[in-house]
């Protein structure tokens, strides 16, 4: 990922927060035909496992990408945070000299590391329990894996494979108009903050916090 120093984010706690908030990742690995393979998959962070944390998830067994992941042994998980189109009309500089163009503000993290594909039924059961409990936790009446018949769950587990990606490298980028003069940054915050699109307002809030 192209990542100029001005936009680089290296703080582990910020990077981990982005992973948790994004939830859905694009998992990419080298393809056997020279074309990269990619799958959209929810991944859960275990921050206390490994130097930079470990990601867990699962794929449908019918998705042949898992075989490519097993063969490659390494993968990149791409997480997107808030993003927004930035109009030149937000800039004070537009009124001063007009030498402005559109851009896009966004937050992204790439997690790179060794990936393990596993099929053991006990590990898969523990994995889906952990993932389910995590995502059901905010609900007033959370669903649990044990709510379904045991034989049914066992049959469902046969249709998936587990993933474990131990993160070796975390690359973070927060492109939030840091390259613009202060008055232009204020204009972007005001412009995005008054948008009817919640995604725009999320970016404005990030810029407003300034960290």
Language-model features, listed with the residues they occupy:
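Binding-site signature for planar aromatic cofactors or substrates
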Residues: 1-211
């Amino acid at each position: 990922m192209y990542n100029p120093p001005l936009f680089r984010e290296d703080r582990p706690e910020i990077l981990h927060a982005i992973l948790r908030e994004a939830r859905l990742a694009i998992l990419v690995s080298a393809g056997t035909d020279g074309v990269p393979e990619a799958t959209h998959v929810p991944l859960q962070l275990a921050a206390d496992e490994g130097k930079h944390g470990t990601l867990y998830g699962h794929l449908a067994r019918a998705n042949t990408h898992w075989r490519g992941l097993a063969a490659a042994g390494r993968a990149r998980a791409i997480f997107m945070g808030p993003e927004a189109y930035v109009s030149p009309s937000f800039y004070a500089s537009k009124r001063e000299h007009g030498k402005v163009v559109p851009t896009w503000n966004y937050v992204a993290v790439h997690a790179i590391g060794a990936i393990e594909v596993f099929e053991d039924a006990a590990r898969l059961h523990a994995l889906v329990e952990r993932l389910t409990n995590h995502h059901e936790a905010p609900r007033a009446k959370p669903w649990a894996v044990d709510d379904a018949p045991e034989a049914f769950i066992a049959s469902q587990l046969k249709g998936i494979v587990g993933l474990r990606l131990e993160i070796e490298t975390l690359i973070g980028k927060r492109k939030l108009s840091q390259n613009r003069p202060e008055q232009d940054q204020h204009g972007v915050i005001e412009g995005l903050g008054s948008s009817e699109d919640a995604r725009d307002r999320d970016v404005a809030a990030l810029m407003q916090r300034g960290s």
